[in-house]
Amino acid sequence: NLGPALLAGGKVAFTSNRNGFAPPKGYTSPTLQLFVMDEDGSNVTQIAPMNVSSALHPTPLADGRILFSSHESQGLRDARMWGVCAIWPDGRRWEPIVSAFHDGQAFHFATQLSDGDVVVEDYYNLNNNGFGAFFRLPLRPPPGEPRFFSAFPEDNPAIDQTVGAGFPYPFTMPFTPRGFRAITPFTTPNDEAAPVGAGGVRVGKVTHPSAAPGGDLLLAWTPGPANDLNRPQPTPYYDSGIYLMPDGGPVTSPSQLVLLKNDPAYNEAWPRAVVKYRDVHGVDEPVELPWLPNDGTVHPSLPAGTAYGLVGTSSFYKRESFPGHVTSWSDFFDGLDSFNT
């Protein structure tokens, strides 16, 4: 049982491998799934049976939803990819917040700032040891606009980063959320050493974003390459400390971070503001969303205690092989369509 998070109404969300499942594609094991229970440990309920691969770190949102990282290895995707989703505490209204589309990409570790924006981390899933770059986004798009840009990368806005060679190299990805922007553009989430900064010193990478009062952001930052491989070098090794990013960023250099604690004898991580929820979010607790009663009153065909049912149609209207095009290395349809092969 991992990652407990306090919800409104005396509930606690957490992840657990108690079902003993293994991910369909392996690589990330075991399968952790989302559960909610009362704060005294009673009424344990699995709320996300769609977590057949894995889920991590539920985080309460002020509007009552739960933010969490979801292992996204479906279909033809790379087995290391994680996205960030939201769900109601009773398991309804599961929806994407930001999805991964680059090989080895993990959107993981998230928090909600005082103004309602969310900060997520992007890192390469393996050699970066959880260190990468931060991105900020609103939970709702501007009025009258869709939440996400196009499925085609070239129709998406450029996102700032600085690559290991030390120069800016913005990237694009499909379905970029509206308002998605870098708040640590001085570094990169990629599988390479952090960029060289002033005086030939590598600028390092960040991890573990956590909201603080007044719109500030706590984080862990390490100088150096923050990558295990010789790309071009792995040393000096990690020396993580706790820092504060004023106003939730952006910052264009690690020198703009405010040092809180960095003992060279230790790696400090997982900062948390030890304050009341109101001090960060302006309310005493998140909205308490209604719980699906499941008491037999919704429909005669659904008696009390009816098991969850999942309905999925995305593979029909937005499948990975668009009509008339199949990725060259995965063309196994012999001239037929993916649904009549």
What are these regions (language model features)?
Residues 12-17, 66-71, 117-122, 217-221, ...:
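Residue position within the beta-strands of beta-propeller blades
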Residues 236, 240-243, 248-289:
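Blade-level signature of beta-propeller repeat domains, shared across WD40, Kelch, NHL, RCC1
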Residues 1-2, 8, 15-34, 48-55, ...:
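A flexible loop/linker signature enriched in serine peptidases of the S9 family
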